[in-house]
Amino acid sequence: APRYSDVLVQAQAQSLRLKLRLYGPDNVDENWYGGEVIETTIKGILDNQEQYVKDTVKVRFDCTITRNDGMYVYAQDVDGLTGEVYSILLYKGYNLTTKKLENGNKVTICGNVAEYEGNVQITSMQDIPLSTSADNIKLISKGNEIVCKEVNPSELVVSNTGLSRCLVRMNNIKVISTYTTKNGGSNDGAVTITGICDGKNVTIRTSVLIDDNYHTITEDVYQNQNIDVTGIVEEYNGAYQIKVVAISDVIFHNN
């Protein structure tokens, strides 16, 4: 069996290296991009989002991983001239298994530009073992600085498009209500927190978080607490919220 698996890996690597199609002539893949890979940056992708999404353009760029949330990975790049931080979502999906997308890792990503619910994301990434394909995720370095912007509720508005997918921190949030998702899906156990900061309402959405004993962290942990949170800015129902993907990103203060 290992003998045949090696043949399959080599065949797949060759097809990627030579840009051979994996579909027959009578089965056209509508999402297949036949053009050259565009070497760019996250800023370049965001600036050309509409056209790149339309053409399902394949891009290659460097970025630093900020947070992991199951199938979703968040990444950033800092403009060396302006210091501006640009962020993007990498859709890992169910099939991509790699240790290269850990927080603080600087990597080269190759994938297709797509859009989901109005937000740009990178799909169709690969990291095939033993393959030398340029399309593989490339680890450049580990332990890189992750830029986290401190924000207040006045900045957390959808017109501030530069915050989308950014890693932010908000301090001194007074929790006033909590709600746990219970709809029979994979998000069961996720908690939505409504809080007040600087006199304004803010919404915090957690992933399904697990404690050190592998128990799901329940909403009562947050009730009536004063907290600082670090998370990813996401749009939901026309408003921004902060998505927390690790309990270590929540700091609790004594009342």
Regions found by a protein language model. Name each.
Residues 4-255:
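OB-fold nucleic-acid-binding modules
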